[in-house]
Amino acid sequence: MQKILFLFGAFISLPVLIANEACEFSRWGEGDEIGNANLINAESILKASQLIKTGKAYSLGVIIDQNTPAYPPRSLSLQVVQPTGQFGKDQFPNATYNDDVFQGWFGIGPQIDGLGHIGDPDAVFYNCFDGKEISQITGLTKLGIEKIPPLVARGLLINIAAVKKVDHLEAGETFNLRDVKRALRAQNISVESGDVVIFHTGWTQYKYDTNPEEWGSGAPGITPEVASYLAEKEVVAVGADTWSLDVVPPIKANEPYPGHGILIQENGIYILETMNTGELADDNVSEFLFVLGPAKVRGAVQMIINPIAIN
């Protein structure tokens, strides 16, 4: 993969596989649409459930609204309405009610990036799907969010801020494989096949509410070698308490978000962004049961989420 093409939103074009010598089909077979989520099964879920020790549940989502910083031009707006109640007209004889109208992008705030999010410069997506064929203005015909099964797995919080002895890393600051391995040793944990790995940098805990403009203008992030390492470990998803996972500004100005391509396009690994990791870090939680069931919007590329970590 030469460069990463960062695509946002749905793609405009009219499900086929690409006959491309440079493209390797997934280990899960031609036509697979869920990537490393195939690693989750009844046995792995039962094993992960044994991590519950205290029963404390942590919300990994954050509150979002029309002022939430987002990757341009993403935004959202919400209107609360009273259908049929115009001009003082009674809605029902026995009740009144509110409805809400959401207008916005699913790739805002705490989100999962699906396997249809990132392609290479030739629009080759995960498992050799041709982006020019699967990407319609009305939604993806392959690799849509609705294909993702329940993600119930062993979760790991890797505390990069702690190993660097800071409250938070700075925008544009990378953490490399050496940093990750130092944190794993310090926490006495190891990455295993089927895990959901989430990095704590302190960025959201210390910047999201107090300085949202700074929070959204850049972010600390992983180096490509970290993404490759986690792909070799066969994880299901990789997340962080940043809006990008990759470092912003990027290491190479003309090659943004390299980790996205390595994880999603090349290996079928999901990305979790803007994870609320502060409370887990404060409680020194390293392992937990991770639970996520994304909304099944047919053809969606990304989805706003609120995963749960149970200690």
What are the functions of these language-model segments?
Residues 19-311:
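Active-/binding-site microenvironments in catalytic and ligand-binding cores
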Residues 4-13:
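Sec-dependent N-terminal signal peptides
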Residues 14-18:
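C-terminal segment of classical bacterial N-terminal signal peptides
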